């Protein structure tokens, strides 16, 4: 049974109802509809913390989805799961792949920056200030991209860039 039929969360049910209506009225191929169904079920599983199920749905959606823009959001969500699982290298890979398909995903840039900043903090704790600076510089680049895409957002990142002298 599709996840959308068993989900008890009000918001997920509402989203599923609206998504089903849109799938009926917007002209799409059966493959696109099936890809979206897997994507929707992946989001539902992800919101409940069922990451293994979410990944299965996202991978199936990736197999079916051909639109680069839609694929970017699937890849982004896969990156979120890997971030939540502490698999930062995999997460960075998926965020990067999402940005290759859709360079207007500031949230992917931000998440990449957060991971790089975290790795910089880890390097400091390990006594490697040179490596830390490399990670912080990379975090700065990703935050600059996120801020350029959505000026006025990511205020804390903007302040960090100013405080550390990385804002240009």
Swiss-Prot record:
- Places the protein is found: Plastid, Chloroplast thylakoid membrane
Q: Please name the Pfam families in this protein's record.
A: TPR_1
Q: What is its main location?
A: plastid
Q: Name one GO biological process term.
A: photosynthesis
Provide the membrane topology annotation. Answer: Peripheral membrane protein
Question: What does the entry list under GO cellular component?
Answer: chloroplast thylakoid membrane
Residue spans of the TPR repeats: 35-68, 72-105, 120-153
Task: List the SUPFAM superfamilies hit by this protein, alphabetically.
Answer: TPR-like
- Keywords assigned: Chloroplast, Membrane, Photosynthesis, Plastid, Repeat, Thylakoid, TPR repeat
Q: Which NCBIfam families does the record cross-reference, listed alphabetically?
A: PRK02603.1
Q: Which family does it belong to?
A: Belongs to the Ycf3 family.
Q: What does this protein do?
A: Essential for the assembly of the photosystem I (PSI) complex. May act as a chaperone-like factor to guide the assembly of the PSI subunits.
Protein name (record):
Photosystem I assembly protein Ycf3
Q: What is the lineage of its organism?
A: Eukaryota, Viridiplantae, Streptophyta, Embryophyta, Tracheophyta
